[in-house]
């Protein structure tokens, strides 16, 4: 999958116009999920909340293969998830396996430093990320 810098609202607009897509919000919580998605997954058990809203939900486990078929989803969304994943490269491989394309939203060290006043890992963050615009690569 190619990596490009984009904006959350651009992606939400695209998804709202393409309702036929099978969209997974991976790492969502019930209080903060993308309304454009039609399948949801997280390590916490939100099944009851999502099922009451007639939304498809799958509980996943850390450091385990994701319980989805190869290329099952047209689009996979990760909003502030990658920085928490202990096995980053294996997790990336799983994302490529289950999704045809997607959107990954990441915090930056600068943002976390300004907002939280520290450049130490916080809120369970295991990684810092930086996008190299010239070479179109994500550094960690």
Predicted features by range, described:
Residues 11-17, 25, 41, 70, ...:
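Non-transmembrane, interaction-prone segments in cytosolic or luminal domains
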Residues 74-86:
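A short SAM/SAH-binding and catalytic strip from SAM-dependent methyltransferases
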Residues 86-140:
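S-adenosyl-L-methionine-dependent methyltransferase catalytic module, highlighting the catalytic core
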Residues 24, 41, 79, 104, ...:
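Active-site flanking residues adjacent to catalytic metal/cofactor-binding acidic residues
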């Amino acid at each position: 999958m190619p990596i490009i810098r984009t904006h959350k609202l651009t992606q939400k607009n695209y998804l709202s116009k393409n309702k036929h897509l099978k969209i997974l919000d991976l790492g969502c919580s019930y209080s903060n999920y993308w309304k454009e998605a039609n399948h949801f997954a997280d390590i916490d058990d939100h099944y009851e909340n999502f099922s009451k809203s007639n939304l498809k939900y799958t509980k996943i486990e850390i450091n385990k293969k994701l319980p989805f078929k190869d290329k099952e989803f047209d689009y996979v969304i990760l909003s502030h998830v990658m920085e928490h994943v202990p096995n980053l490269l294996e997790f990336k491989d799983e994302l490529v396996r289950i999704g045809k394309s997607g959107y990954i939203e990441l915090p930056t060290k600068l943002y976390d430093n300004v907002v939280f006043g520290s450049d130490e890992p916080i809120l369970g963050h295991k990684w810092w990320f930086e996008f190299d615009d010239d070479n179109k690569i994500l550094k960690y």
